């Protein structure tokens, strides 16, 4: 779908992975933003280390691109243990999970991204592992099949999800710590852009960093991606100097406006205004009208628009706010 080509999509692109790993903070002291989360995690980690215990199982949720994977790796680094990483869709069979669990050392971290996509059979195996550090596996088939219990070392499961509401209650209830990551403010994003520019050895001033931050939709992954594209523009058009004017010109060229909107954001909002009189409009109708999938609209496009007050989800459907009308130069006539 069109979402896969978006410069400002918050999900990771292949080009992001290598650079993001290089500039990713390794410890809580280097982590910018999410102050409340960091303060709590610092206390929980120090307490667990003082007792020589595994950290309680941790669930991290929030929109994509906000640093869930980064935080999971920081937790492992702060605890001084190894981390094994996988994702819900990869764990197709109970044996896939069993292989990971039986290779964990004491107090290690197992990180499962997209944990809401675990299959029911794998999830069932996870319950006793999380609660009692035991693995129940079946040996044999048919009438000769029998269950055996394997003892596991104490470990920490860190689950990450963009859809906390999709987790089953039994799984959600087994996490001792639950943290929600919020969209970043411009001040914190500016610091992230400056830190990334330092690692990339770029000539970027404060105003240039802030201009990139303002258009990053509250998402560090987007900030870093926009920074790389602005770098390309500056190398050709401005001798590598990234000022506010250079950043603004580059992002205008890339079709990312002052609010961080791209073509898909504008299409969604203006479609509701032009074709559905500002709403309400149901999700299925909206998806058909803009040619995008329901999940992409719900998980990728809408969260930032709702958080910024341009769009509302109501029981009757999606409604565009007065702010959206004014942003696009429409006369506002409440429905």
From Swiss-Prot:
Family, as annotated: Belongs to the RuvB family.
Annotated binding of Mg(2+), by residue: 69
Record region (Small ATPAse domain (RuvB-S)): 185-255
Entries under SUPFAM superfamilies matching the protein: P-loop containing nucleoside triphosphate hydrolases, Winged helix' DNA-binding domain
Organism the protein comes from: Pseudoalteromonas atlantica (strain T6c / ATCC BAA-1087)
Subunit structure: Homohexamer. Forms an RuvA(8)-RuvB(12)-Holliday junction (HJ) complex. HJ DNA is sandwiched between 2 RuvA tetramers; dsDNA enters through RuvA and exits via RuvB. An RuvB hexamer assembles on each DNA strand where it exits the tetramer. Each RuvB hexamer is contacted by two RuvA subunits (via domain III) on 2 adjacent RuvB subunits; this complex drives branch migration. In the full resolvosome a probable DNA-RuvA(4)-RuvB(12)-RuvC(2) complex forms which resolves the HJ.
Region described as Large ATPase domain (RuvB-L): 4-184
Gene Ontology molecular functions: ATP binding; ATP hydrolysis activity; four-way junction DNA binding; four-way junction helicase activity
GO CC, one annotated term: Holliday junction resolvase complex
Entry EC number(s): 3.6.4.-
Top enzyme class: hydrolase
Coiled coil residues, start to end: none
Purpose: The RuvA-RuvB-RuvC complex processes Holliday junction (HJ) DNA during genetic recombination and DNA repair, while the RuvA-RuvB complex plays an important role in the rescue of blocked DNA replication forks via replication fork reversal (RFR). RuvA specifically binds to HJ cruciform DNA, conferring on it an open structure. The RuvB hexamer acts as an ATP-dependent pump, pulling dsDNA into and through the RuvAB complex. RuvB forms 2 homohexamers on either side of HJ DNA bound by 1 or 2 RuvA tetramers; 4 subunits per hexamer contact DNA at a time.
Alphabetical list of Gene3D superfamilies matching this protein: 1.10.8.60, P-loop containing nucleotide triphosphate hydrolases, Winged helix-like DNA-binding domain superfamily/Winged helix DNA-binding domain
Localization per Swiss-Prot or TrEMBL: Cytoplasm
Keywords, in A-Z order: ATP-binding, Cytoplasm, DNA damage, DNA recombination, DNA repair, DNA-binding, Hydrolase, Nucleotide-binding
GO-annotated biological processes: DNA recombination; DNA repair
InterPro entries (alphabetical): AAA+_ATPase, AAA_lid_4, DNA_helicase_Holl-junc_RuvB, P-loop_NTPase, RuvB-like_N, RuvB_C, WH-like_DNA-bd_sf, WH_DNA-bd_sf
Residues that, per the record, bind ATP: 23-24, 65, 68-70, 131-133, 174, 184, 221
Lineage of source species: Bacteria, Pseudomonadati, Pseudomonadota, Gammaproteobacteria, Alteromonadales
Family matches, as PANTHER family: HOLLIDAY JUNCTION BRANCH MIGRATION COMPLEX SUBUNIT RUVB, PTHR42848
Stated name of the protein: Holliday junction branch migration complex subunit RuvB
Residue span of region Head domain (RuvB-H): 258-335
Catalyses which reaction(s): ATP + H2O = ADP + phosphate + H(+)
UniProt keyword Transport, yes or no: no
């Amino acid at each position: 779908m069109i979402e896969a080509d978006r410069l400002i999509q918050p999900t990771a692109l292949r080009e992001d992975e290598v650079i993001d790993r290089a500039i990713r903070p390794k410890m809580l002291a280097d982590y910018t933003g999410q102050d409340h989360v960091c303060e709590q995690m610092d206390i929980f980690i120090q307490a667990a280390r003082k007792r020589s215990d595994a950290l309680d199982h941790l669930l991290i949720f929030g929109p994509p691109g906000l640093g869930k994977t980064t935080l999971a790796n920081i937790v492992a680094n702060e605890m001084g243990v190894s981390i094994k990483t996988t994702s819900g869709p990869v764990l197709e069979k109970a044996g896939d999970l069993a292989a990971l669990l039986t290779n964990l050392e004491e107090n290690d971290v197992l990180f499962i991204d997209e944990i809401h996509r675990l299959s029911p059979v794998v999830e069932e195996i996870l319950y006793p592992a999380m609660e009692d550090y035991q693995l129940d596996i079946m040996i044999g088939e048919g009438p000769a099949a029998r269950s055996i219990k394997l003892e596991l070392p104490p470990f920490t499961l860190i689950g990450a999800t963009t859809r906390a509401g999709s987790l089953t209650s039994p799984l959600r209830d087994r996490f001792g710590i639950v943290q929600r990551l919020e969209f970043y403010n411009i001040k914190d994003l500016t610091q992230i852009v400056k830190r990334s520019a330092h690692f990339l050895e770029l000539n970027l001033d404060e105003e240039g960093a802030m201009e990139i931050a303002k258009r990053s939709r509250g998402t560090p992954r987007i900030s870093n991606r926009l920074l790389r594209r602005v770098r390309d523009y500056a190398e050709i058009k401005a001798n590598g100097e990234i000022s506010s004017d250079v950043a603004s010109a580059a992002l205008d060229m890339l079709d990312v406006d002052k609010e961080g909107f791209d073509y898909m954001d504008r299409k969604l909002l203006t479609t509701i205004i032009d074709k559905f009189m500002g709403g309400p409009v149901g999700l299925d109708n909206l998806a058909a009208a803009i040619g995008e999938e329901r999940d992409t609209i719900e998980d990728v496009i809408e969260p930032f628009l709702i958080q910024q007050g341009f769009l509302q989800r109501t029981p009757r459907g999606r409604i565009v706010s007065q702010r959206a009308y004014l942003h696009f130069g429409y006369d506002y006539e409440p429905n």
